[in-house]
Swiss-Prot record:
One of its GO terms (molecular function) is orotidine-5'-phosphate decarboxylase activity. This is Orotidine 5'-phosphate decarboxylase. GO terms for cellular component: cytosol. The gene is pyrF. Belongs to the OMP decarboxylase family. Type 1 subfamily. One of its GO terms (biological process) is 'de novo' pyrimidine nucleobase biosynthetic process. Homodimer. Catalyzes the decarboxylation of orotidine 5'-monophosphate (OMP) to uridine 5'-monophosphate (UMP). It catalyses: orotidine 5'-phosphate + H(+) = UMP + CO2. CDD domains: OMP_decarboxylase_like. Its EC number is 4.1.1.23. Pathway: Pyrimidine metabolism; UMP biosynthesis via de novo pathway; UMP from orotate: step 2/2.
Length: 230
């Protein structure tokens, strides 16, 4: 089921920055926010508990990737935080993903990172020794995530239709690399607008800089939300 709220990537260096950012929004507006590695490692679980206490939904993007037993143990802890969605790396393999899903259960949605939106085919060839296209690699990882029982994957909107065809219509596609029309693409190479992501079948979109660096974050958020739901 498609999430109507864009997920806001809280890519801030400090707790105070997040508090300042949230002041742009009324208290009764419940957001869906992403906490990434930098912020979580700097602040710890306290940030999750704080945001959940305010009634916001949490996408914890830690991209766990280790041996199956270690990821299982880590996920058993994360599952107690009240998060709504969390990530592992599909490259960790079917057993690792399956163990993570078993211990997490229905406490939160578990999605796998396929190829990062900053990854080019040259990067895949030179650094990962993968001699296929980005799309072929992403679809293969998506199939493995589905096999492991995960709820979906993180992928570029450009791969959504292929992934749905290779897995299932209800297999979730979480799409970063979303930029409003005319904005800077930054360091992400595979990007789309909110409208394009909607039309192509994305279930969630993740937006960072166009909202958190906007002069008026509330206006920017609602404009992107409007585009996403149009």
């Amino acid at each position: 089921m498609r999430e109507e709220r864009p997920i806001i990537a809280l890519d801030f260096p400090s707790f105070d920055d997040v508090k300042d950012f949230l002041e742009h929004f009324p208290e009764d507006e419940k957001l869906y926010v992403k906490i990434g590695m930098e912020f979580f490692y700097a602040i710890g679980p306290e940030i999750v508990h704080y945001l959940k206490g305010l009634g916001h939904s949490i996408f914890l993007d830690l991209k766990l990737h280790d041996i199956p037993n270690t990821v299982r143990s880590a996920m058993s802890v994360l599952g107690t935080f009240g998060i709504d969605m969390v990530t592992v790396h599909a490259a960790g393999g079917v057993e690792m993903m399956s163990e993570a899903k078993k211990v997490l259960g229905d406490k939160a949605k578990l999605v796998a990172v396929t190829q990062l939106t900053s990854t080019s085919e040259e990067d895949m060839r030179d650094c990962q020794n993968i001699q296929t296209t980005v799309q072929e690699s992403v679809v293969n990882y998506a199939r493995k995530a589905k096999e492991a029982g995960l709820d979906g994957v993180v992928c570029s909107a450009q791969e959504v239709e292929l992934i749905k065809a290779a897995t299932a219509d209800d297999f979730l596609c979480v799409t970063p690399g979303i930029r409003p029309a005319g904005s800077e693409i930054g360091d992400q190479k595979r990007v789309m607008t909110p409208q394009e992501a909607h039309q192509i079948g994305s279930d969630y979109i993740v937006v960072g800089r166009p909202i958190i660096q906007a002069e008026n974050p509330w206006d920017a958020y609602h404009e992107i939300k409007k585009q996403w739901n149009s």
